[in-house]
């Protein structure tokens, strides 16, 4: 703790960029490294989840993510469930963002498009397309709309439900309606639930006690895209937040006699090195936004924005162009080959090589690797 003034202290925290992996074991071949992990009954070959935003995940994108061994999460409150011509609507948003120098012009259009009511049939059809492809089907809803939307999604055949907001707690209190008690809500569902985001040990532990299969750390913070720091004064020191959630996971594992809750890191991961450091800090998998938005399959055509950018009264995100010209395939972004020396392509290959150099052969073991912090 540090004193920031008389009678007021604050905790010193660390970002992923502050942390460095320290290899200290016998090196091994990257071919002998496994990046597989399992969330409840669902096995994935790579520890990568696509951030649930219309700029990224369409049914086709989610299917390709599944084919490549990852998980694409559809935004259940996005434009896909509101407009039949969603690709045309997103093209309009991108056009405004590219032409208008004022960033609020594209935000206003996003807000207008999100003002259209959700159509359960459209949303159900999108879920059905993913399910019919034979990949794991996951949809994100906000805490305030979880109770209303979940029955439709379960009926459509989702495998995983993601309850995600900027910040989430085990119980959401509302003066204008019934509070959402996650423990009760999750216990009544037949599908596993992933919940987040959380920033600290206590909230992570509380969410684990609700019965969630996974806990998301962070809210997808990305420089130039997310503006929760500017709007709310809230930001996430990801290295510290991941390590705190991992400590909560160990505590809950002891408390329950063996129930393992997965920690998913969402924010400030831009390269394969960041991905490796997130796992090293204790994450089981990462949630990626801008790195995947550079792919040809991404719905935003080289642009990225978070779901919070469309909030009707307090947007907390901006539109950012992340790719120009010809874009790489999603397969190249995830598994290569790469011609980029800075780690933006072959993300999983970079992770595998980092694990091999450090002498570890699976993700859970790699969470024990040595770390240092720069001055």
From Swiss-Prot:
Linked residues for Isoglutamyl lysine isopeptide (Lys-Gln) (interchain with Q-Cter in protein Pup): 99
Alphabetic keyword roster: Isopeptide bond, NAD, Oxidoreductase, Ubl conjugation
GO molecular function: IMP dehydrogenase activity
UniProt-listed Enzyme Commission number(s): 1.-.-.-
Stored InterPro entries: Aldolase_TIM, IMP_DH, IMP_DH-rel2, IMP_DH_GMPRt
Pfam families given in the database record: IMPDH (PF00478)
One GO biological process term: GTP biosynthetic process
Cytoplasm in keyword set: no
SMART domains: IMPDH
Entries under PANTHER family matching the protein: INOSINE-5'-MONOPHOSPHATE DEHYDROGENASE, INOSINE-5-MONOPHOSPHATE DEHYDROGENASE RELATED
Family statement drawn from the similarity comment of this UniProt entry: Belongs to the IMPDH/GMPR family.
Protein name in UniProt: Uncharacterized oxidoreductase MSMEG_1603/MSMEI_1564
Lineage of source species: Bacteria, Bacillati, Actinomycetota, Actinomycetes, Mycobacteriales
